[in-house]
Amino acid sequence: MQQIRAIVGTQWGDEGKGKIVDFLAKEADVVVRAQGGNNAGHTVEAFGKVFKLHLIPSGILYKDKLNIIGNGVVIDPESLIQEIESLEKEGISTENLKISDRAHLVMPYHKILDEEQERLRGEESLGTTKRGIGPAYTDKTERTNLRVCDMLDEEEFVQKLRTVYERKNQILTHVYHKTPMKFGELLEQFMKYGEILKPYITDTIKLLNDSIKAGKKVLLEGAQATMLDLDYGTYPYVTSSHPTVGGFCIGAGIAPKYIQEVIGVVKAYTTRVGKGPFPTELLDEIGNSIREKGREYGTTTGRPRRCGWLDLVVVRYAVLINGIDKIALTKLDTLSGLPKIKVCVGYKYEGKVLDLFPASLRVARECEPVYEEFEGWSEEEIKAAKEYEALPKSAKRYIEFIEKETGAKVFLIGTGPAREDIIIKD
């Protein structure tokens, strides 16, 4: 493998990045999570078990890999500690986990504010996970948030908490009519978190760059995806960070010149959670069938995902923004059994055909997808195939069409949920 690889989601998240990272982590020495919080969820099936990871990189399932939670991640210590304990209970060591001392904290008031802000938006709600991620990033931008390193310095923590404590309580009590938080309880709680997490906390920027200089192979693991990026996604129905390659450099603390290969994870169909435009959405039995067969329910929230045909306008856009070199195609098996399969290649709007995703949500809502149709394949044919040439002709046509339309080669194909259900192409 190239020394530094970045794994990015090309759609609205839930593409199966966790499985791809888990597969590629075999060849890596270091796996890094660079942005987002516990609003994300990666599901990996290994050792006959299902692991649902929210903050910890998927490389943790390998004993000899260094796993880093970078400075761009916002961390809810309670959630992280629960995740660590859950892994340890299953016999998975977390000794090789390191947490950036520069990462920002999700505080209890962030979670309350997230929930109350969503409630007040009513029908205009954004569909957040209510985990406090947006408010934490807001405080980071306002330069009023607390960081992981502050949990290791009580004096510093007290000083920083005092500057925001009264204001947050005023908002909670006067605007949202909530019970005020108690300073002493917050302080005690986070000092306890700091003690538990202290062995994991370090300067990960130095650690990562020293690893690169030593020739270690690094995998940058994205959470969420391109269409949820704060700048490039379907704003305002986006996340509060940058799940694109540029965001990985900032959130991990490495220079862009080090990234040698960008891998885009593409689900063989499209899904999204929550509100926002979705041109290829299927509001029929086919959509329901894909949801049930693909187990399309949120790892973090359990919410049913909206399902639709593969949208190459979206994927093309992600390839352009991220400079994607190769594609890992996932969940090809979920489409098995459908007599006909459609792929969107453009959007028809006011007499024109758009080949890249528009900025305007009105255009995205009102456009008409332009489809190409393909013959389907059976589940037996997909399950029996262990190499590319053994795939049914119709599936190979589907894959080769994706390559032609996006300009990126497909090199991995997911044919089932298990770790070993992957075909290597070329």
Curated annotation (Swiss-Prot):
Substrate binds at T299, T300, T301, G302, R303, P304, R305. Pathway: Purine metabolism; AMP biosynthesis via de novo pathway; AMP from IMP: step 1/2. GO terms for molecular function: adenylosuccinate synthase activity; GTP binding; magnesium ion binding. Its cofactor is Mg(2+). Its EC number is 6.3.4.4. GTP binds at residues 13-19, 41-43, 305, 331-333, 414-416. The keyword Cytoplasm applies. Its main location: cytoplasm. It holds the Pfam family Adenylsucc_synt. InterPro entries: Adenylosuccin_syn_GTP-bd, Adenylosuccin_syn_Lys_AS, Adenylosuccinate_synth_dom1, Adenylosuccinate_synth_dom2, Adenylosuccinate_synth_dom3, Adenylosuccinate_synthetase, P-loop_NTPase. The keyword Magnesium applies. Mg(2+) binds at D14, G41. HAMAP family: Adenylosucc_synth. PANTHER family: ADENYLOSUCCINATE SYNTHETASE (PTHR11846:SF0). Homodimer. Plays an important role in the de novo pathway of purine nucleotide biosynthesis. Catalyzes the first committed step in the biosynthesis of AMP from IMP. This is Adenylosuccinate synthetase. It comes from Caldicellulosiruptor bescii (strain ATCC BAA-1888 / DSM 6725 / KCTC 15123 / Z-1320).
